[in-house]
Regions:
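A glycine-rich beta-to-alpha transition motif near the start of alpha/beta enzyme domains, typified by
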Residues: 1-112, 163-275
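Active-site donor-nucleotide binding/catalytic segment of nucleotide-sugar enzymes
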Residues: 155-158, 263
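Selected transmembrane alpha-helices and immediately adjacent juxtamembrane segments
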Residues: 153, 161-164
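N-terminal, positively charged, Ser/Thr/Ala/Gly-biased leader segments
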Residues: 1-22, 118, 135-156
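Short, charged/polar, Gly/Pro-enriched secondary-structure boundary elements
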Residues: 124-128
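Membrane helix-loop-helix hairpins that form the core translocation module of multi-pass transporters
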Residues: 115-123
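Short, conserved active-site entrance elements at the starts or edges of catalytic domains
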Residues: 132-139, 179, 184-185
Length: 275
């Protein structure tokens, strides 16, 4: 079986072309391949599949084998793969995901895709649709407690659940413990991705991400989108923000006229391999 290792700002994936390969047990396969000691090592597994409703279908599995509804970095990697490996000559693509169809425009340099602008769709803010257990419809600056410490979170779904927490200091947060406790907090029926954010200007912020089913990652596309939506809802930033993550920067814009979030960032091939 041939695979390709790719990443978006260090958020890395093993990509399999399911037009020619067959994966019998995707969750187990993801756990095996993504192990950084006994496998290839990655944050997740991406299966590039045929689709009856769009150009391609993306199936994503986290490193623990759980299903990811959407991935902003992963979808850019998929776009680079299908263009660079000749599965399409189109620069504008529609991709079927578990969270719906997403459209993206590839950025081409020297005949290769180097990144993409992705329409990440409508941010879901209703507590039930995220889901977050709450007596209120919107979860904005809402208290939550873990390890006898109180935080304020804003809940958003970008095709997967996010809890965004703003803080003046994020580098000293023990994310290995705090992130895990928050991910499995009883208020999140489907668990949650956690973002700790420090706003440095109306158009810039720094973010650390704890990804559901993975742990702390160098970047998270849906997390960056959720962070910007949350910062706008809390009147901390404008609608267009540069998000600095551990692995680099993403550009995010929440166009409130159409209520869609747009994400722009790079996609990089690391290597090909054979299993």
């Amino acid at each position: 079986m041939i695979f390709t290792k790719m990443h978006g700002l260090g958020n890395d994936y093993v990509c399999i072309n399911c037009f020619r390969e067959r994966v019998e047990d995707p969750p187990g396969f993801a756990r095996t391949l993504c192990d950084r000691h006994y496998g290839i090592g990655a944050d997740g597994l991406i299966l590039i599949c045929p689709s009856k409703v769009s150009d391609f279908k993306m199936e994503i599995y986290n490193s623990d084998g759980s299903v990811a509804g959407m991935c902003g970095n992963g979808i850019r990697c998929l776009g680079k793969y299908v263009y660079d490996y000749g599965l399409t000559g189109k620069e504008t693509l529609s991709i079927e995901t578990k969270s719906g169809i997403r459209n993206m425009h590839l950025q081409i340099r020297d005949g290769k895709a180097c990144g993409a602008m992705v329409d990440m769709g409508v941010p879901r803010l209703n507590a039930h649709s995220i889901p977050i257990l709450s007596e209120k419809d919107l979860v904005i600056n809402d208290p939550i407690e873990v390890q006898e410490k109180n935080y304020r979170m804003t809940g958003i779904s970008m095709g997967n659940p996010h809890a965004v927490i703003f803080s003046e200091e994020i580098n000293g947060i023990p994310l290995e413990e705090t992130g895990r406790e928050l991910e499995f907090h009883p208020r999140f029926p489907e668990r949650a991705n956690i973002e700790f954010c420090h706003v440095t200007a109306r158009n810039r912020m720094e973010v650390r991400v704890w990804e559901r089913g993975v742990g702390e990652t160098l970047a998270c596309g849906t997390g960056a989108c959720a962070a910007v939506v949350a910062s706008v809802l809390n009147d901390l930033t404008d609608e267009e923000v540069i998000v600095k993550l551990l692995g680099g920067e993403l550009s995010v814009r929440w166009d409130r006229k159409v209520n869609h979030v747009f994400l722009e960032g790079p996609a990089v091939k690391v290597f090909d391999g054979v299993l």
